């Protein structure tokens, strides 16, 4: 038994169906089937864990609020205390192409609500949920906040985001870097041929908009693939490719093409068929006089055939030594890519 049978004889999904949700950039349902029994649970659980923990994203790491020394402070004219403001800042969704850290600033006077859309971004930073409310200002109140944004993966607690040389007033924030917000999956039975107990894996995915759900699954699968490579302790035997030996022909391979493959009128094609002319090799050996003696074959059909043959560099009345070959049907199949 060859080692390849361990994986080559397992059934693999013949399709991956992606159904976008109401917001195609954030929601989607993916269905993979058929899978070997048990593989739906295995793949679904592994992909879900990687999707939630291991994809790269961007998030706020810390914030500095003018006039605030620590997160247990309050700000005159701001209805929320700093603790609530920090909790709201955690929910800001960000897309950033380059490497961090980078800065964002928001500055606003009351009365009114400060939203994520008020943040002044620079470079390649995009705020994905601009309607998110950060705080509410009374008349005459003013606030200025400076955010530090960075890239990472998974969840990082606020204490880990505090630099050793953090200045007074720098407030670290819990960072949820993962662009994937929710993942659920279910496994059902599906049918393949006469077998009814294969697995059907359905995954429902929600992202923050920094990545599409199907791209997120693709990256997660690539991460798993890369991590599993270390467990493969062998090289696959190379398949021996035997090159087919094409025999030399004593005539043009185009003669092996059937005349019904030519673009002829129905009348001309029927006349050739009734005269038992099957291959071009049969046709080119005929003279014009012989063709005109064919029942229902007239000058118009003759001119049509002469024109088609001329386009191939052929003509009527040719001599074809060795025609027809004994194994003509076999040769026609072997040379079908050569004419």
Swiss-Prot record:
It holds the Pfam family RNA_pol_A_bac. One of its GO terms (molecular function) is DNA binding. Residues 251-339 are annotated as: Alpha C-terminal domain (alpha-CTD). Disulfide bonds: none annotated. One of its GO terms (biological process) is DNA-templated transcription. Its EC number is 2.7.7.6. Keywords: DNA-directed RNA polymerase, Nucleotidyltransferase, Transcription, Transferase. Residues 1-235 are annotated as: Alpha N-terminal domain (alpha-NTD). Homodimer. The RNAP catalytic core consists of 2 alpha, 1 beta, 1 beta' and 1 omega subunit. When a sigma factor is associated with the core the holoenzyme is formed, which can initiate transcription. The N-terminal domain is essential for RNAP assembly and basal transcription, whereas the C-terminal domain is involved in interaction with transcriptional regulators and with upstream promoter elements. Belongs to the RNA polymerase alpha chain family. DNA-dependent RNA polymerase catalyzes the transcription of DNA into RNA using the four ribonucleoside triphosphates as substrates. This is DNA-directed RNA polymerase subunit alpha. The gene is rpoA.
